[in-house]
């Protein structure tokens, strides 16, 4: 049961899906799309970035805010990166493979391609691109998908280069890795047709399914990211970036709606109180020269403790806007953009070693009354000033309502401030890459892949897989291998579709859950495994043990692993003699239990021959001997 009636609230939401493509080369250079270990980096360099004017003489507001603090950006480079990633050389032509994949995706979304594709530069000054901009190209528009809530428009599909990956922050420096920079990705933007949290998840799941249907997208953490645009009636558009887990999308939408409703409540309360924000910044450093608060002692040492007066804000700064987050948290997020650790406000004081007497001293110094609040920042003078100015601006926005902004998704479903929404000044033409013609003939030559949903139904109807297994295989990373193996063993007596599927999506995950790294298993390992089963060299009961051994020692061949585990072909006469001997020894037990003795005795036989002889063969041989023994009795 949903907490809110989203249609009554006027919820409008849209998604932007960013998916890395699994092309051989990067988008504007011929470097491989390999993800490297940071320890493999063999050199590094650094940059300082600043906001520049667009062709119209304007500066993007998000870029201006991000460059208020001078940050050093350090880039880790590899033997698989080149001068283009370093921004020391112009880009090459756009990757044809990436373009073909993207056009195939556009067909699955019923989109119309542009006649001529132009590459643009999108200003990005958070350090994630060495050049200070990201290259992007608008490829297709006017698409749609059908959902349980009706048709959802797909407004645009762009081809972009991936950003560098942030490794760590060290003071005023941020370290990035260049292995990811330039990997091709598609950005798919829906229309604001999403009407509820569940609908948002449904749309995201469908888009993800379409992308995986290509077989040409990267998989794993960080290879796909969802951004969510949300607004409600009387609110403003807020963009939430970096939702990596599909399970989080519903919570993100619910909690953003809750945040906006609470901000509107705070706004109404502030208006009724006739609240306002004082422009003056107060230096209260002298009031804390003898403070016992360790946090403020550091502020005194750094040189500055500044305060701002919020008239009629008392008890509203501590008002919760999302679970565990308050209006004061929103103020703190803004302060942190200046490089400070956070702030203090009256709704949480006295605390942190700050006494009631010290709180009153600040109130007296700045003229705060019982209905007022104040915020306080302690840091180096310039950082503290920028931080308190940011808080003053955010407090003013609280009186106006909901600010348009870009926020980042947090692991618990909440969000935190990142930067203002970018404006039109963010984008300008890329002059180093020529336009690309998309002719009707070229577009018609692109054949869209079969959707995974259709493929799963085909596996169920044609290959005899049950629905659950068919869906698991269709959506798994082993889909291409499954289809190869299925074709190889179509008429094999010992290897069928169910065995192949259970191995790939049942046994392999089980091995992984046991703590063994299964990424070491190659297609050749699986091909060798099923060849051995087909040739009756091993039984299917040996699959888990054999794959575990290969995962631990991937340099082994299947035959070498079989020998090492002692899983050689069985001698039927030897097995028959073993079973006859056991039946004679367990004669009294068989006389007592009759045919039901089969189960317990089967355990003894399997313990001896598991992985060497197929269980069905052993069961048949044992039953035959038990029946003979009972018949002779």
From Swiss-Prot:
Record keywords: DNA-binding included?
no
Between which residues do disulfide bridges form? none
* Pfam families, alphabetized: GAD, GatB_N, GatB_Yqey
GO annotations of cellular component type = cytoplasm
User: In which domain of life is the source organism classified?
Assistant: Archaea
Please give a single GO biological process term from the UniProt record: glutaminyl-tRNAGln biosynthesis via transamidation
Entry's SUPFAM superfamilies?
GAD domain-like, GatB/YqeY motif, Glutamine synthetase/guanido kinase
Please list the reactions this protein catalyses.
Answer: L-glutamyl-tRNA(Gln) + L-glutamine + ATP + H2O = L-glutaminyl-tRNA(Gln) + L-glutamate + ADP + phosphate + H(+)
Give the keywords, sorted. ATP-binding, Ligase, Nucleotide-binding, Protein biosynthesis
The signal peptide here is none
GO MF term (any one): aminoacyl-tRNA ligase activity
Task: Tell me which EC number(s) this protein carries.
Answer: 6.3.5.-
- Subunit description: Heterodimer of GatD and GatE.
Q: Which family does it belong to?
A: Belongs to the GatB/GatE family. GatE subfamily.
Q: What does this protein do?
A: Allows the formation of correctly charged Gln-tRNA(Gln) through the transamidation of misacylated Glu-tRNA(Gln) in organisms which lack glutaminyl-tRNA synthetase. The reaction takes place in the presence of glutamine and ATP through an activated gamma-phospho-Glu-tRNA(Gln). The GatDE system is specific for glutamate and does not act on aspartate.
Instruction: List the protein's name.
Output: Glutamyl-tRNA(Gln) amidotransferase subunit E
